[in-house]
A protein has these predicted regions:
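Intrinsically disordered, low-complexity Ser/Thr/Pro/Gly-rich regulatory segments
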Residues: 1-76, 80-195
Length: 195
């Protein structure tokens, strides 16, 4: 019971941190650069959370996966791997890593909206050439209804993602209340712990 309470508190804290840079609905205007920065904020916050549950033999980073002959994957939001990276660029505010393909356990793609697109499918296909598993973690399912989130989840799974998660449910209308998705959060942390 205490673990569930702690995990729920971490989920609520993560949602609060992301609220400093709120998502907008598809009906509101948003600058493209802001969307890119928003994605980095989400994936870096998720990396911080993963580190708390990740078994010690693993590392987690943002970067690209590299084969022995020098082929590079597309950029991966989150890579979980064992061993040492090929190279890592570290500054006070950023860390970008090149990870050997044979050391990768899972790659996690982050997105703001729980809405499948052709881009998700093509990016997934490109990543699967470099990683054994790919999870998708979306910030928000814009829906009042569980069945719409369930349908979106199934679409992502049908594309080939190994598992799919989202943080909260919200709706475009006047009531912008967020409904935290405890079930996915607990499942995600369990998946990380069981690597």
């Amino acid at each position: 019971m205490a673990l569930r309470t702690l995990r729920r508190a971490r989920l609520n804290s993560l949602i609060e941190r992301l609220d400093l840079f709120p998502l907008t609905s598809k009906f509101e205007k948003q600058e493209p650069l802001f969307l890119f920065a928003r994605g980095l904020i989400f994936s870096s916050a998720l990396i911080e959370e993963i580190r708390q549950d990740l078994p010690r033999r693993f590392s987690v980073c943002w970067g690209q996966i590299m084969t022995e002959d020098g082929m590079l994957s597309p950029e991966a939001d989150i890579i979980i791997y064992e061993g040492s990276p090929y190279h890592e660029w570290k500054t006070e505010v950023m860390r970008f890593t090149l990870v050997p393909k044979d050391q990768v356990t899972v790659s996690i793609e982050c997105c703001e909206y729980f809405r499948p697109t052709k881009h998700h499918k093509s990016h997934l296909n490109d990543l699967l050439r470099f990683t054994p598993k790919v999870f998708l973690f979306a910030e928000c399912c814009w829906s009042k209804h569980k069945y719409q989130c369930k349908r979106a989840r199934q679409s992502f799974l049908d594309m080939g993602f190994d598992d799919v998660f989202f943080l909260y449910k919200s709706y475009y209308g006047i009531d912008k209340e967020k409904e935290a998705n405890d079930a996915d959060w607990f499942r995600f942390l369990d998946a990380i712990r069981s690597l």
